[in-house]
């Protein structure tokens, strides 16, 4: 009895230590600002006490140097990094790459040691200037999608160069070392072709495993976007299209469990059924599902678009749900499947959870009757992260005051403001704490982070 109590105490201590060290890594995108007003998302909409790390997606690359992508990226950087005044423990990273970025610029950059050093120096300068705490490499994928096989070794060299430079810069400057992470695939073929796992794991602070997109409307039958386990009867390659197989692969190839962060999606993959009466897993499909009312992309639905579908079922052996209505079918994750995945990653001793993406959860609590961020808040609770503690009065940062005009134009008296103007940001003569943003001929009014004002000279929010 004494031994069992002692063992229980040890296990409790381990759980407390694990929980306090767990990471909850959340991505946000710089294109969610263009969605319709009800679901438009800016960095200022991020709850600063929700995630331990927030990664801004995406930066680009020009002439082997980090670069912005959207015309107002630098303002969005400021919005994000100002959240650290509310939660000094929050870490922010900048992700470079992404699916649509492709591989060519990465391939050119890693081709020579000189090119890599150009990138390394630009990354150091860019991250420090913009106030980020680290860099996330999202090359999709070295050794794949037109990237030559030699990029596998060159990607390792890039990571080692960055890690060395980040360490040296921290020692010389006295600043906290910049973090270095990477987003990586689940597919065995892509992993084998592009990643020297044991080597890169030594230099990266953590690895974000993209454990989703296992099935999509590119296939002729329905399948789940992110199943935890294989389905009964699956074998061969089909049996590897799940979270457990992906985690096992990365662990077997040499990733320390504490560095592996399990990615989870706040979106679902949708299909159009060949027949509405044949609506199970593996049912024939004719193509992607219809665009969602807010995300407006074929084959993809946000959690806030899928959560209200009535005809919902669970794939018991895969621990995930799907739903259908008429000839539309969607596989997605919900609170229950996130709990199952959180329990799984704790059992495996992984370093935490990653979420793609903040803006596809029901971030306002407007659609699913579960409060704001139901999926991500579930992870925070299940990972035993500390509850948000009230700030003392001197720590409270006032929120930007509500705008008197709608965020989406045209607006009264300003219908023609963006006509003849290039996409970009412009001062608001009536209120220097806000600015006008012209994009595609539409007018938006946006607010600077608290305490900052907009200056036309730098087209940025700065101290008054």
Curated annotation (Swiss-Prot):
SUPFAM superfamilies: (Trans)glycosidases, Chitinase insertion domain, Invertebrate chitin-binding proteins. It is an enzyme of class 3 (hydrolase). Residues 1-21 form the signal peptide. Disulfide bonds join 26-51, 307-368, 448-461. It comes from the Eukaryota. The active site is at residue 140. One of its GO terms (biological process) is polysaccharide catabolic process. Chitin binds at residues 70-71, 97-100, 210-213. Residues 415-464 form the Chitin-binding type-2 domain. The keyword S-adenosyl-L-methionine does not apply. Changing residue 136 to N: Loss of activity. Residues 22-386 form the GH18 domain. It catalyses: Random endo-hydrolysis of N-acetyl-beta-D-glucosaminide (1->4)-beta-linkages in chitin and chitodextrins. SMART domains: ChtBD2, Glyco_18. Pfam families: CBM_14, Glyco_hydro_18. Monomer. Belongs to the glycosyl hydrolase 18 family. Chitinase class II subfamily. PANTHER family: CHITINASE, CHITOTRIOSIDASE-1. This is Chitotriosidase-1. The gene is Chit1.
């Amino acid at each position: 009895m004494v031994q069992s109590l002692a063992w229980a105490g040890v296990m409790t201590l381990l759980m407390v230590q694990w929980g306090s060290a767990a990471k909850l890594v959340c991505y946000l995108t710089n294109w969610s600002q263009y969605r319709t007003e009800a679901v438009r998302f800016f960095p200022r909409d991020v709850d600063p006490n929700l995630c331990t790390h927030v990664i801004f997606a995406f930066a680009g690359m020009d002439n082997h140097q980090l670069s912005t992508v959207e015309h107002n990226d630098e303002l969005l950087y400021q919005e994000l990094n100002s959240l650290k005044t509310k939660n000094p423990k929050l870490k922010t990273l900048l992700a470079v790459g992404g699916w649509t970025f492709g591989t060519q610029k990465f391939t050119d950059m890693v081709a020579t040691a000189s090119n890599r050093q150009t990138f390394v120096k630009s990354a150091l300068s860019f991250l420090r200037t913009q106030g980020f705490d680290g860099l996330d490499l999202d090359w999709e994928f070295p050794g794949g999608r037109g990237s030559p096989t030699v990029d596998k070794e060159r990607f390792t060299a890039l990571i080692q160069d960055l890690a060395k430079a980040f360490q040296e810069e921290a020692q010389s400057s006295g600043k906290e070392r910049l973090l270095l992470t990477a987003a990586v695939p689940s597919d065995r073929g892509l992993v084998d072709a592009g990643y020297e796992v044991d080597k890169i794991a030594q230099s990266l602070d953590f690895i974000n495993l993209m454990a989703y997109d296992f099935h999509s409307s590119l296939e002729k039958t329905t399948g789940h976007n992110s199943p935890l386990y294989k389905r009964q009867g699956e074998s061969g390659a089909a049996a590897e299209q799940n979270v457990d197989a992906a985690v096992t692969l990365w662990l077997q190839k040499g990733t320390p469990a504490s560095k592996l962060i399990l990615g989870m999606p706040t979106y679902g993959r949708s299909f159009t059924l060949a027949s509405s009466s044949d609506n199970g897993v593996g049912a024939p499909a004719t193509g992607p599902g219809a665009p969602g009312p807010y995300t407006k992309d074929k084959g993809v639905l946000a959690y806030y678009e899928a959560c209200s579908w009535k005809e919902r079922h669970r794939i018991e052996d895969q621990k995930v749900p799907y739903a259908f209505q008429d000839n539309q079918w969607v596989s997605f994750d919900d609170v229950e499947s996130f709990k199952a995945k959180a329990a799984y990653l704790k059992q495996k001793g992984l370093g935490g959870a990653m979420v793609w993406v903040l803006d596809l959860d029901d971030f306002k609590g407007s659609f699913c009757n579960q409060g704001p961020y139901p999926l991500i808040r579930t992870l925070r609770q299940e990972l035993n992260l500390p509850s948000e503690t009230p700030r003392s009065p001197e720590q409270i940062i006032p929120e930007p005051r509500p705008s008197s005009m709608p965020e989406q134009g045209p607006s009264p008296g300003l219908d023609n403001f963006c006509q003849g103007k290039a996409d970009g940001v412009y001062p608001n003569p009536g209120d220097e704490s806000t600015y006008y943003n012209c994009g595609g001929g539409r007018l938006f009014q946006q607010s600077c982070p608290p305490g900052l004002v907009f200056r036309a000279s730098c087209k940025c929010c700065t101290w008054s």
